[in-house]
Amino acid sequence: MASKFKEGFKEQKAKTNANMQKFFEDTVRFRSFFTCLVLAALLVGIVSLVISLVNIDRNSTPITTLPSGADGNSANFTEGSIADVANKVTPSVVSIVTETSVQSFFGESSGQAAGTGIIVSKDGYILTNKHVISSAKNIQVVTSDGQIFEKASVVTTDPLNDVAFIKVDASDLKAANLGDSKTITAGQQVVAIGNALGEYQNSITSGIVSGTGRSLTASDGSSISSAEALTDMIQTDAAINGGNSGGPLINAAGEVIGINTATTSNANNIGFAIPISSVKGMLKSVLETGKGERAYIGVRTISITPEVATAYELPVKAGAYVYSSNKYTPIVKDSPAAKAGLQEKDIVTKVNSATIGANGSLSSLIGEYKPGDTVQLTVLRSGKTMTINVTLDAYKASDNSKN
């Protein structure tokens, strides 16, 4: 009986490997050809400055990298624990391969791209980056043990962030444990897992949190209009490569604290991840309704830094300052903020017990809640501190607000 079981296992493993090889065959050939072109360009001295979601414009991103020995308040890895964390989380990480239409001088043709996803429910909901699945004609998902789902569907995308949820028909997947990104600190050790370069599934890298609250502009390189401003990002020196987009950034407890999103090709060891807490509200909405909506309050703010505080003569050096511009009013009409009585020049310092600045931006902290939830804002107005309860609504594209 044991002999038959081993033979059956070997046969099944061989079939799985064959399926995986066939699945990535076209992608490998395409990337091999593309790699040759890139090497040829380098030999003649061409330096590419194209910004993409894996190529960040450094001029728009103030970066300060901490030394690898920096102290953090969270638990760090011990010898062997990186492998333990990787073994714990890898079953919850999937590879994503998309088929897209490519327009050229010769007409329309098909292309392939690859990314990574995080399983967030046993019945097949998967979290990834929006840019991984945008414009895809077909989405295929491969689990860490080689199971292939030929057609995944897009459930929803975040209108304000590079986040998407997709769904496969499953009933017994292993969901990842999600941590609290509000408590991470610079110097804390982390692990990244992903489908590196679209060819090396379940690649493991490690590093530290180099900084938090980073802002940057990213694009998939297809057009100027594809550029997207990303705020409140986690900076890490854990290696993040093309194909890692949508994969998890993990703490020493084996909890997902970020979604790996971007890196830069013109500097080493600089990658960025979206804080996981900022997508928990949409996740709750997805799991409860099967649709997924982003919560918002409808107020236009600027994050307060010491420089902003000086420029606007503000009494605090952190928080969210409600301001107007020539194009937009400070409070969206009929929004939750308007109904709650928020005003221009208010300074929001807390969302419930979370402090804006130390624990994240206003937008990021609101992202932890779903439409219909009520949050308590701590507000500084004309030198007086008050609390205002706001019942969140679902974001609408016409609202023109990031919060």
Feature locations, PLM:
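N-terminal targeting leaders characterized by basic, low-complexity, disordered sequences
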Residues: 1-23
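Serine-dependent protease modules
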Residues: 3-5, 29-36, 40-311, 316-318, ...
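Flexible, small-residue-rich helix->loop connector segments that border functional cores
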Residues: 85-86, 345-348, 377
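Intrinsically disordered, low-complexity Ser/Thr- and acidic-rich flexible linkers and loops
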Residues: 105-107, 326-335
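Conserved PDZ fold ligand-binding element
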Residues: 126-127, 334-360
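PDZ domains, with a preference for the canonical peptide-binding region formed by the helix
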Residues: 132-134, 271, 350-378
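A short glycine-leucine-enriched loop at secondary-structure breakpoints
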Residues: 181, 248, 312-315, 330-347, ...
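Surface-exposed loop/turn motifs at beta-strand-loop junctions within extracellular Ig-like
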Residues: 381-383
